[in-house]
């Protein structure tokens, strides 16, 4: 799964995307081809150097017999993009702290139950949780893993 921070820049090498011819401004965000090359580092790194410099190591924030909550990307500094991973073993209620976020099911299947509906979930399902949704219940069939992305200070969900 690739999750892109809204502040990230994307330079496109291809001249066509979904049958549409892209202008140079669309491909290089208006900075031009030559300046785009300056955005990249051409210094070679070993696998260990690359891992130490750029890989985020998950940190266990909370764990009990029902669920494990890991910080994948903390969302620091304040109000920046954050990612957590939730691994469910049993039925668990979570509180969303009045903030919208998205969820992606990465492993397992089950149900998500809110005050007004119940939805079956499978790997690859993307979910939008609006800020007005105070609480939801995750009911896994076996083990279920979900990535949650949000922009509020971590932790932006609470395990109940």
Annotate the PLM regions.
Residues 87-116, 123:
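Glycine- and acidic-residue-biased ligand/ion/polar-headgroup-sensing regions
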Residues 2, 58, 83-85, 102, ...:
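Conserved hydrophobic/aromatic beta-strand scaffold that supports enzyme active sites
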Residues 9-91, 97:
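C-terminal amphipathic alpha-helical segment
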Residues 92, 109, 118, 135, ...:
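Residues that cap or initiate secondary-structure elements
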Residues 104, 127-129, 144, 152-153:
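Active/binding-pocket-proximal capping segment
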Residues 1-18, 22-24, 142-159:
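A short hydrophobic beta-strand segment most commonly corresponding to one strand
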Residues 1-4, 10-11, 94-95, 112-114, ...:
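Short beta-strand His + acidic residue motifs that chelate non-heme Fe in jelly-roll/DSBH
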Residues 114-135:
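Short acidic-glycine-tyrosine-enriched beta hairpin
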């Amino acid at each position: 799964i690739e999750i892109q921070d809204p502040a990230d820049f994307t330079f496109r090498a291809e001249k066509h995307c979904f049958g549409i011819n892209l202008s140079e401004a669309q491909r290089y965000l208006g900075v031009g081809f030559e300046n785009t090359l300056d955005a990249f580092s051409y210094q070679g790194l070993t696998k260990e150097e690359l891992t130490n410099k750029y890989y985020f190591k998950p940190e266990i924030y909370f764990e009990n017999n029902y669920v494990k909550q890991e910080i994948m990307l903390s969302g620091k500094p304040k109000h920046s993009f954050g990612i957590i991973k939730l691994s469910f073993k049993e039925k668990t209620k979570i509180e969303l702290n009045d903030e919208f976020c998205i969820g992606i099911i990465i492993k397992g299947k089950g149900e998500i139950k809110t005050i007004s509906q119940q939805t079956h979930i499978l790997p690859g399902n993307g979910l939008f949780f609006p800020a007005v949704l105070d609480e939801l219940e995750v009911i896994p069939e076996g083990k279920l893993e979900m990535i949650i992305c949000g922009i509020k200070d971590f932790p932006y969900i609470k395990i109940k």
